[in-house]
């Protein structure tokens, strides 16, 4: 039945007795290979995607639970591999950034990969630029993980962006010394 007020949503070539909504074409589902804790590559197109709004430890970064170091970067990679291995991903693009697509993605087991990573404490909220979309459920997921001392929040760790900056600075200094 065609309801009044829905005529604007009617497809141009559909008979007037049949309602057909105008919809955006859905992106094709992806099969991916994980690059690091927030990035993966489509195995067919080789396009690189990065989860929007979060950061995870670098693959070689560690955290410390008491006196015990643990590989928080490897854990983030393992979490993302487990969530995506042999599963189709449905991703919506937020924007392109360099040669990567910033995306929000879901699988059959995860309504929002980034939110679930935050909830499990394997990722943290990324610093957002002023014009970036803030996602309240992401902040709530991180607050929940932090309150429950899940994952990173049970440990001492350096924020991933600070760790990468320090590592890059140290690497540059090491290269200068070698010259």
Could you tell me what each predicted segment is?
Residues 3-179:
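Small beta-barrel nucleic-acid-binding modules, primarily SNase/OB-fold domains
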């Amino acid at each position: 039945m065609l309801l009044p007020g829905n005529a604007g949503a009617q497809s141009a070539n559909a008979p007037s007795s049949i309602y057909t909504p105008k919809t955006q074409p859905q992106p094709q589902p992806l099969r991916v290979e994980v690059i690091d804790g927030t990035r993966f590559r489509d195995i067919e197109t080789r396009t690189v995607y990065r989860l929007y709004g979060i950061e995870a430890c670098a693959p070689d970064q560690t955290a410390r639970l008491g006196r015990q170091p643990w590989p928080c970067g490897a854990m983030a990679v393992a979490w993302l591999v487990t969530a995506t291995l042999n599963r189709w991903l449905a991703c919506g693009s937020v924007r392109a950034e360099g040669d990567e697509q910033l995306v929000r993605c879901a699988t059959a087991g995860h309504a929002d990969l980034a939110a679930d990573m935050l909830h499990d404490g394997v990722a943290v909220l990324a610093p957002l630029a002023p014009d970036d979309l803030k996602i309240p459920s992401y902040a709530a997921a991180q607050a929940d993980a932090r309150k429950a001392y899940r994952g990173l929040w049970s440990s001492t760790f350096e924020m991933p962006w600070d760790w990468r900056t320090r590592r890059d600075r140290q690497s540059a200094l090491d290269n200068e010394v070698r010259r």
